[in-house]
């Protein structure tokens, strides 16, 4: 344990789907749990059962049958502050078991996070949790640090939102950031829909979690979608079976790659957007012509929705088709990319040069929440 060191910084990456939290300097987060707050659907009937009025994270997940589940972070942006406070409280006191007033805390935010949101995060940290110091960093920038680079373009795709963020010498270029409201949760919903067409019914929030598991275990990205569809139609080589919690076994075939294909063809779910290969290209084209070469050669994948087998090869193929023919294109898919935002935060918060970057409680008291715009960019 490193918390005997009084001042170890905490790193908390709040995603739409999962909270990743732990101590700076560690190589992986200590706590990873769903960003969910659940409230009982019915009045408790058992006397003395000690019914709580709300449950957070894994406990909410395990009692999902009797709860209504809410996600306080939608599309990467915090929308429900009361529930978010519950999640932070749970993170500090139940998961990490630390007193937040003793540790500087690094939080992450979505690219293009509204200014009012950064201020609100800052305010809650200092006023509710009394942290001695805090900092807010952009998720994609941290992922790039984790890959050992300061220049590149990050495709960060999690549960609620996908971003393309070009970064030059450590600074995100806001004018070229592309946001796509299509990510893991939408792919899970789409898989629920196409499994229903196969005759398997998944409807409740509890059943959605089962489908998410099917997606994580069996889905992959096809290098050539049409070819793969033809193969799936003529042979059973692509079929896999999955055992449901009640013991029933279901078989899935072309759904395995039709589900993540949505990332490249959002029209599958009725979205009029460009696919992730095109948004990457568009983002690069919005950057200065002199840095494009560096971006093409440093395409870093980050987040859980980039974990599909085959996604890097497919990106390589698609971007090569869009880019100038002589351009060197490299897709970097680090094996730990599911947690690379957190890892980047852990690296950043433990750098000696970073120590003067923290916003201290004193600075906050003097300047108020708007200090965050001056210190964190």
From Swiss-Prot:
In tailbud embryos, expressed in embryonic muscle (myotomes). Its EC number is 3.6.4.-. Its main location: cytoplasm. GO terms for cellular component: cytoplasm; cytoskeleton. InterPro entries: Actin, Actin/actin-like_CS, Actin_CS, ATPase_NBD. It is found in: Cytoplasm, Cytoskeleton. PROSITE patterns: ACTINS_1 (PS00406), ACTINS_2 (PS00432), ACTINS_ACT_LIKE (PS01132). One of its GO terms (molecular function) is hydrolase activity. Residues 1-2 form a propeptide. The modification Tele-methylhistidine is found at residue 75. Keywords: Acetylation, ATP-binding, Cytoplasm, Cytoskeleton, Hydrolase, Methylation, Muscle protein, Nucleotide-binding, Oxidation. The modification N-acetylaspartate is found at residue 3. It catalyses: ATP + H2O = ADP + phosphate + H(+). Oxidation of Met-46 and Met-49 by MICALs (mical1, mical2 or mical3) to form methionine sulfoxide promotes actin filament depolymerization. Mical1 and mical2 produce the (R)-S-oxide form. The (R)-S-oxide form is reverted by msrb1 and msrb2, which promote actin repolymerization. It comes from the Eukaryota. The modification Methionine (R)-sulfoxide is found at residues 46, 49. Pfam families: Actin. Xenopus contains at least three different sarcomeric alpha actin genes that are preferentially expressed in either heart or skeletal muscle. Belongs to the actin family. Actins are highly conserved proteins that are involved in various types of cell motility. Polymerization of globular actin (G-actin) leads to a structural filament (F-actin) in the form of a two-stranded helix. Each actin can bind to 4 others. This is Actin, alpha sarcomeric/skeletal. It comes from Xenopus tropicalis. The gene is act3.
């Amino acid at each position: 344990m490193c918390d005997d060191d009084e001042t170890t910084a905490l790193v908390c990456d709040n995603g739409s789907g999962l909270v990743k939290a732990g101590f700076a300097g560690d190589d992986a987060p200590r706590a990873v749990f769903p960003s969910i707050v659940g409230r009982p659907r019915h009045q408790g009937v058992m006397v003395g059962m000690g019914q709580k009025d709300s449950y957070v994270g894994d406990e909410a997940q395990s009692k999902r049958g009797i709860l209504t589940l809410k996600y306080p972070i939608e599309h990467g942006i915090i929308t429900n502050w009361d529930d978010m406070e519950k999640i932070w409280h749970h993170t500090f006191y139940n998961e990490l078991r630390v007193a937040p007033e003793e540790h500087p805390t690094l939080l992450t935010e979505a690219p293009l996070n509204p200014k009012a949101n950064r201020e609100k995060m800052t305010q809650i940290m200092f006023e509710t949790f009394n942290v001695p110091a805090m900092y807010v960093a952009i998720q994609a920038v941290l992922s790039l640090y984790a890959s050992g680079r300061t220049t590149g373009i990050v495709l960060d795709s999690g549960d609620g939102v996908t971003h393309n963020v070009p970064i030059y010498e450590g600074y995100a270029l806001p004018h070229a950031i592309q946001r796509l409201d299509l990510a893991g949760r939408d792919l899970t919903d789409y898989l629920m829909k196409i499994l229903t067409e196969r005759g398997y019914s998944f409807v409740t929030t509890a059943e959605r979690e089962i489908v998410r598991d099917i997606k994580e275990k069996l889905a992959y990205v096809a290098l050539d979608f049409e070819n793969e569809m033809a193969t799936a139609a003529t042979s059973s080589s692509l079929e896999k079976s999955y055992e449901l919690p009640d013991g029933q076994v279901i078989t899935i075939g072309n759904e395995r790659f039709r589900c993540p294909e949505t990332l490249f063809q959002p029209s599958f779910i009725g979205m009029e957007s460009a696919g992730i290969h095109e948004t990457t290209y568009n983002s690069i084209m919005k950057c200065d012509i002199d840095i494009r070469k560096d971006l093409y050669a440093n395409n870093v994948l980050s987040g859980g929705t980039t974990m599909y087998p085959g996604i890097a090869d497919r990106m390589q193929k698609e971007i090569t088709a869009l880019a100038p023919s002589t351009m060197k294109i490299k897709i970097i898919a680090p094996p730990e990319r599911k947690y690379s935002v957190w890892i980047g935060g852990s690296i950043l918060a433990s750098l000696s040069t970073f120590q003067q970057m923290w916003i201290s409680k004193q600075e906050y008291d003097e300047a108020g929440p708007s200090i965050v715009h001056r210190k964190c960019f």
